[in-house]
Amino acid sequence: YARMITGREYFGRRQGKVRACFDFQDFDWTGENWKKIPARDMILYQCHVRGFTKHKSSNVKNPGTFSGMEEKLSYLKDLGVNTLLLMPAYDFNECMHDENGVDLKKVNYWGYTEDAFYFAPKAGYAAKKGEQAKEFQKLIKAVHSQGMNVVMDFYFKDVSPEFMLTCMRYYALRFHIDGFRFNQECVSVEWLRQDPVLSHLKLFGYHWDECGYEAGQEMFCEMNDRFLVTARRFLKSDEGQVEDF
């Protein structure tokens, strides 16, 4: 699988051919201070890597990047947050297609698309071209040094359960990710429970009880984000939100 992508360095721009490239970089995790936070104590902050610091008010050196987010970790810690839930931070194609070809004005900002290279950190989130893996690792190390955890959100589409498990293991081992949110109905709970890597992480999903979940298992975390979604819509003045509130 492609672990680094070239040709998508500039977010929202079509830049010609997309190619896989070699990645021989090592990373020094010395001094990481990695601690696992119990699920019951997690205070999650869901964020988009680019959107979190892209506005000039963020006052970071490299807005809209992994490095930019690293600069704001102390701000998040002051809020009381101890776990980051990152919306897709792997490489996805944000340039959307329509029936007549490519509409350059349409951008899939959030990254929930099947047109993705799941094993490659997003090139468009790197401050320096070709450094996306290193900058992502640096971000994770800084998060852990703050006593916080990181959960990645994956939108797997039309891939096998084996692919999903392999992908999550890769990020857990190479990037020290603490957990994942994913469409868990595609994977056997027993596989997850017996996995030598994933069984030690936090796995977020909806309706684990329908997948064979048994109460009291620390690794399985139930997503309950209805208030989050309704509150956001209410603040945007969307119609019909008072009743939902």
PLM regions: where:
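The feature marks proteins involved in alpha-glucan
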Residues: 1-44, 54-57
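Hydrophobic faces of well-ordered beta-strands that scaffold small-molecule active sites
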Residues: 43-45, 84-86, 150-152, 180, ...
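Conserved, mostly hydrophobic/aromatic
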Residues: 47, 76, 86, 118, ...
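A conserved hydrophobic secondary-structure block that centers on an alpha-helix together
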Residues: 50-84
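Aromatic- and acidic-residue-enriched carbohydrate-binding clefts of CAZyme catalytic domains
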Residues: 58-65, 96-149, 156-177
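Surface-exposed amphipathic alpha-helices with a cationic face
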Residues: 74-77, 137-146, 190-197
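Carboxylate/His-rich catalytic cores and anion/metal-binding grooves
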Residues: 76-107
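Active-site-proximal helices and loops of the catalytic beta/alpha 8
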Residues: 106, 113, 167-169, 173-245
